[in-house]
Amino acid sequence: MLVSGSIAYDLIMKFEGVFKDALLKKNLANLNVSFTGLDKKMFYGGCGANICYNFSLFKGLGISSMLFGVAGKDFKEYGKKLSDDGVNVDLVGIDNDGFTASAYVLTDNRENQLTIFSPGAMGNINVEKKLTDKILKELDYAILSPDICERTVRLARKLKSAGVSWFFDPGQMTHAFKLEDLKYLTSNAFGLIANSYEIKLLCSKLKISENILRKKFNVMIETLGEGGLNVYKKSGVKTHIQSVKPLKIIDPTGCGDAFRGGFLAGLTKGLSIEQSCKIGALTATYKIEKPGTQNHKFTLAEFRGRYKKAFKENCSI
């Protein structure tokens, strides 16, 4: 499994209130607001790295992921941590003059989040040359999660040329893609994974309906947070997958990445899209019960037991 995406340090803070209470709808065009961030903590993060970490929780199944992206001169410790977790970091390019990207995340009392992302070294190196024909031939799937837009497009073209099926996961970069690039990405991806807002934004930029967007992919997965997710097949079949109730809610940061890691693990093991989505949903629940994006763990036996309790069926991995 090839995972393309950001590698970052996350600085997580809490806001004791609700964001909307500090905003005046009539004055949004002249926004000048300050929020107090409490309990600042730093964690390992980045969409690509988070997905790989969650995928690695299933390494006991004999599957592995390769992280594709760029980090800075401060990546050595982070890289060792990922390697120890079972993530292959050979395709990570290092900018020895820049720093690894950083995300500043503020969460309010209703789990709404504001994020400021500093790309750092992300756009400074071309790492596609690391992706050899030998590596491409060994891939089952790939996912293109949030990264520098130009690199996402270059990688998509390379994967298409090699015949590798890939998922488009634009996330917070949805707004940044050029129209012609969005048309290419949505016309050539095997599947799309996005939340409701990102799907609406895609439709707005492409000037098409959601129904037409769904028909572009073999599968489109619409994530709904605690509402679970919807799976749309090109055939028109829609399936709803419930979320798994957490024992406690500690930190929602990275839940989407956790879902993707679990989903891709299931898919790599040959499970159906629907079964893989259930694997992803439970992985996300484990994540929300811990602070940070790479601090949750489970054994396969624990996971299978909780899966059976949540979905009333045996886990197929």
Predicted stretch roles:
Residues M1, L206-I317:
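Conserved phosphate-binding/catalytic region of the ribokinase-like
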Residues M1-M66, E77, I317:
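Glycine-rich phosphate/adenosyl-contacting loop at the front of the ribokinase-like
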Residues I7, D147, A258:
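Active-site metal-binding loops of divalent metal-dependent hydrolases
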Residues G37, S64-D90:
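A glycine-rich beta-to-alpha transition motif near the start of alpha/beta enzyme domains, typified by
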Residues S56-G60, K160, T268:
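Gly/Ala-rich phosphate-binding loop of Rossmann-like dinucleotide-binding domains
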Residues F68-K73, D90-T100, N218-L224:
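Beta-strand->loop->alpha-helix junctions that form or flank phosphate-binding loops
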Residues D90-D95, A103-P146:
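Conserved phosphate-binding/catalytic loop of the ribokinase/pfkB sugar-kinase fold
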Residues R154, K160-H240:
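Conserved phosphate/ATP/ADP-binding segment of small-molecule kinases
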